[in-house]
Amino acid sequence: MAALTSYEMAASILLCAEDSSSVLGFGGEEEEEEEDVVAGKRARCAGPPPPPCVDVAGVDFAVPSEECVARLVETEADHMPREDYAERLRAGGGDGDLDLRVRMDAIDWIWKVHSYYSFAPLTACLAVNYLDRFLSLYQLPDGKDWMTQLLAVACLSLAAKMEETDVPQSLDLQVGEERYVFEAKTIQRMELLVLSTLKWRMQAVTPFSYVDYFLRELNGGDPPSGRSALLSSELILCIARGTECLGFRPSEIAAAVAAAVVGEEHAAFSHVNKERMSHCQEVIQAMELIHPKPSSPSRVFVSSSIPRSPTGVLDAAGCLSYRSDDSAVASHYAASSWGYEHDSSPVSSKRRKISR
């Protein structure tokens, strides 16, 4: 018998015989559900956060080789939601359709906690990737609003375990004022459901997997500037929040973002379909996420005038204005929905300790 790999051993240890509906105890009594889900509001944050900062080193990208990029392109479709996911989200309300509000509520929570702990940009991108893939494959039970929050906790927890070196306890992830506070064992069961539904493909291919490669291609092979790295990260996260680009491959999004940041409208890359990339560029332009600053053609910034809408491109507070000297100024706003002021940009945030 062949020896099990560490991946297979982990799977055999954690996976169990129950079907997905029993992992969270849907078939059990209501008393079991109430035991696992602790209802009630809890405020864990006291006072406003310190001024936001931008850590340029925090958005440094790994440099993939030509062969690595080719392999990523071959496998990236395995790390995307079902093809009909975006259409079902926008349809909403009908049989088999998905509720767009469920996705937005989950992403709002992920962004809040991500900003609170100053996680890496890739962590937010992974969490949204897990969320979208899960929602495209698994129908959440009706009448169980608490599952939206639980799913968001599980997706961010898994993403943090994949990307972060300092991962908070699952209980500590539940910051702010929430209707439900989940026990660690409940979050672990939800994590198992997400893992099994996604077939343990957690090292997901995202636009971050490619963006440095494309930025270097457009920069003559030299490393991109700190400004380009920051702006690319912010754009990718803004795009991830919305639904407009769900039908595009990660490589197409990364190529379009790199071209937008550098200002190369007619850029072309060997691993990306030119027509698809151009279409993605048009979608990003229509979203008005990026355009030249009126005062100077050399200045490019992420628009902060985008209102929140059902298709939720991004929170206005998640926008940074970039200057040619590679510095950035983050906007502050009062987040009334969470009960405290914070900067919701995952790229420009400063960690604060939880008050016990």
Curated annotation (Swiss-Prot):
Keyword check for Cell division: yes
Family: Belongs to the cyclin family. Cyclin D subfamily.
A GO BP annotation: G1/S transition of mitotic cell cycle
One of the Pfam families matching this protein, by short name: Cyclin_N
The protein's name: Cyclin-D4-1
Alphabetical keyword list: Cell cycle, Cell division, Cyclin
GO cellular component: cyclin-dependent protein kinase holoenzyme complex; cytoplasm; nucleus
Gene (UniProt): CYCD4-1
The keyword Cell cycle is annotated on this UniProt entry: yes
Xref: PROSITE patterns: CYCLINS
Gene Ontology MF terms in the entry: cyclin-dependent protein serine/threonine kinase regulator activity
